[in-house]
Amino acid sequence: MQKATYYDSSAIYSGYPYQSANGFSYDANQIQYPRTSHVESEYHRPACSLQSPGGSVALQKREMAAENCDRTTAVQAVQSKVHPESNQPQVPVSAPPPPPQSPGAISQTTSNGSNQPTAKNSSPTSASRGKQIFPWMKESRQATKQKSTSNTSSVESCPGDKSPPGSAASKRARTAYTSAQLVELEKEFHFNRYLCRPRRVEMANLLNLTERQIKIWFQNRRMKYKKDQKGAGMMPSPGGQSPRSPVGPGSTGAGGGGYLNSMHSLVNSVPFESQSPTSYNKPHQNAYGMATSYPPPLSSSHNNCPPTQKRYAGTDSATPEYDAHPLQGNGSYGTHMQGSPVYVGGGYIDSVPNSGSSVFGLTHLPHPPSANMDYNGAITMGNSQHHGVCDPTPTYTDLTSHYSQGRIQEAPKLTHL
């Protein structure tokens, strides 16, 4: 009703003789205003269209643009008389204005009604602008989250083997090799620890595996091999001997079972760094092939003798009991029996000037001439090697009854070592 009243009042005021023909206004507050044709051209002026999107914006800027809006009100009044039918369809569509408090408020209401198409045109722009800001930003954030999650999942899935055990989604399935595949892989690793690519392709086709699986298996197998080698290298050698010693760990089986292996004898004779003058080979029962060489003593300057006798029990009837025999020769006792255990016994080689062998005085010097070989070992040792400081009566039990002359022929086989 108020809207109709406003429009009726404008029609009443427009009934005064000063109308649009002269360009004067009906209101004392207004000055002259343009013609109707000019009003038609200025129908969409931007002066009040800035305030058209909402009534709240119009109220906020009412004081600033009062003159422009009043002028637009007068123009609308003239247009309402000239074109009454064009404004009537716009009345119910116009936004509800705030309650009138002054003629400025009335002019604001009329301006809202007159500039409704502009409001319609500008409101979609603001709505589209809002859609461009908030939903677009929200969608981009979701897309960013999706991209970040996809990137992280791809990064986690790329290492494969190195993925943490907790990430179940990106954890690579463990490859289960069959026994046939493992046999072929181990066989190939035995011959060649590093595979070339053609061979890897061939094995991949043969075992129905991928090249990557075979490559990774060989990498893991090489690491395991290195660990095994490192663990074996840290342990002492089986014989406890110098690396240049020709006597192997399996040589104890050829000698008598009562003879200690070289590692144990080394522990028992730590102060002594020499070989025993005797070595035994057991080709058959109780037959000992003894290859002993005793160069004549150069001097009798022996420092000490072992404090106790070392008893080494032979097999069956052969139980030799003898002490260590310090010799000051070249340190080569010629104990070169093939496959016989070496007794690292109690000779003192501290004062040996010309010993070119290792610290153990092992069998690296040339074999003494066969003229020094005496198979009657007890007599030779008793006559030429025992001195008054040591025990003068070493006992050799039943050794001279089983010497085999033919076993000494095996001795020169290892002299080149």
Curated annotation (Swiss-Prot):
Keywords: Developmental protein, DNA-binding, Homeobox, Nucleus, Transcription, Transcription regulation. GO terms for molecular function: DNA-binding transcription factor activity, RNA polymerase II-specific; RNA polymerase II cis-regulatory region sequence-specific DNA binding. InterPro entries: DUF4074, HD, HD_metazoa, Homeobox_Antennapedia_CS, Homeobox_CS, Homeodomain-like_sf. Residues 104-129, 143-156 have a biased composition (Polar residues). It is found in: Nucleus. A motif (Antp-type hexapeptide) lies at residues 133-138. GO terms for cellular component: nucleus. GO terms for biological process: anterior/posterior pattern specification; embryonic skeletal system morphogenesis. Residues 70-174, 229-256, 311-334 are annotated as: Disordered. CDD domains: homeodomain. SUPFAM superfamilies: Homeodomain-like (SSF46689). The keyword DNA-binding applies. Residues 170-229 bind DNA. Gene3D superfamilies: Homeodomain-like (1.10.10.60). Its main location: nucleus. Pfam families: DUF4074, Homeodomain. Belongs to the Antp homeobox family. Sequence-specific transcription factor which is part of a developmental regulatory system that provides cells with specific positional identities on the anterior-posterior axis. This is Homeobox protein Hox-A3a.
